């Protein structure tokens, strides 16, 4: 019996920093990061090229309480450094699972991580390595969602997979409204008109303009990542 082929050859996975916390209130939960890496490894074994953009909200958020009274640009740089810490942890967990991971940072920290160079990133992906993009876009005032849209467009990803704690986009908050229903798919224009808050406007506009679809799915739901990559009805597809 022949196995179904993956629906995508090259993907950009956007992981929030909060996703690494698991049930903890702060930081990186070891069991959670190991489970995530196992799911990523399963997808790479299908021959899919995986790049990751990771957030830093489990350590520091430039727009959150810890940054009150702080210069916004300074706070954003601190948030970028938090993403580097997360990227190193993720790469370490991947290397222990027999994956080969490369961290590429938008901010130069040469003793610790490689600088982001697009041709090198593409080479790593072609070689079957997982590339983890750290430090967002390298600029303050831009979110890691925008970094995911930017890197996704740069590397020619077929889709941005936004991993969240909810299994898609709903008509309302499913935890507050029991009648809320999940969208199977909707257009960028519909999502923007309904103000569904899937990504910030800059990230969303970039994906729309580059005709780069976004699929929102739950990273907590076991096997969801693989189902998304296989093109199954999982999460919510936002298309042009």
Swiss-Prot record:
Keyword Nucleotide-binding set for record: yes
Chemical reaction(s) catalysed: UMP + ATP = UDP + ADP
Pathway membership, UniProt: Pyrimidine metabolism; CTP biosynthesis via de novo pathway; UDP from UMP (UMPK route): step 1/1
Gene Ontology molecular function, alphabetical: ATP binding; UMP kinase activity
Localization terms from the record: Cytoplasm
EC number from the UniProt entry: 2.7.4.22
Positions contributing to ATP binding: 14-17, 57, 61, 164, 170, 173
Family matches, as SUPFAM superfamilies: Carbamate kinase-like (SSF53633)
Quaternary structure, from the entry: Homohexamer.
UniProt record similarity statement: Belongs to the UMP kinase family.
Main enzyme class: transferase
Residues the entry annotates as binding UMP: 56, 76, 137-144
Entry protein name: Uridylate kinase
Regulation affecting activity: Inhibited by UTP.
Presence of the UniProt keyword RNA-binding in the record: no
UniProt superkingdom: Bacteria
InterPro entries: AceGlu_kinase-like_sf, Asp/Glu/Uridylate_kinase, Uridylate_kinase, Uridylate_kinase_bac
Function, as annotated: Catalyzes the reversible phosphorylation of UMP to UDP.
């Amino acid at each position: 019996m022949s196995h179904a082929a993956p629906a995508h050859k090259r993907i950009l996975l956007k992981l929030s920093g909060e996703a690494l916390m698991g049930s903890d209130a702060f930081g990186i939960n070891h069991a959670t990061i190991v489970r995530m890496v196992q799911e990523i490894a399963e997808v790479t074994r299908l021959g899919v090229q995986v790049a990751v953009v990771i957030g830093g909200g489990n350590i520091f958020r430039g727009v959150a309480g810890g940054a009150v009274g702080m210069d916004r640009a300074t706070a954003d740089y601190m948030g970028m450094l938090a993403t580097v810490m997360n990227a190193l942890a993720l790469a370490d967990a991947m290397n222990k699972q027999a994956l080969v991971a490369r961290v590429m940072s938008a901010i130069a920290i040469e003793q610790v991580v490689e600088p982001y160079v697009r041709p090198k990133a593409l080479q790593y992906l072609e070689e079957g390595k997982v590339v983890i993009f750290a430090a967002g876009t390298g600029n303050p005032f831009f979110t890691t969602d925008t970094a995911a849209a930017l890197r996704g467009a740069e590397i020619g990803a077929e889709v941005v997979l936004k991993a969240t704690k909810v299994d898609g986009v709903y008509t309302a908050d499913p935890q507050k409204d029991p009648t809320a229903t999940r969208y199977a798919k909707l257009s960028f224009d519909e999502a923007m008109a309904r103000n569904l808050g899937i990504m910030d406007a800059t990230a969303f506009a970039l994906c729309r303009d580059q005709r780069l679809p976004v699929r929102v799915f739950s990273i907590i739901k076991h096997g969801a990542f693989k189902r998304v990559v296989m093109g199954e009805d999982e999460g919510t597809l936002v298309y042009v």
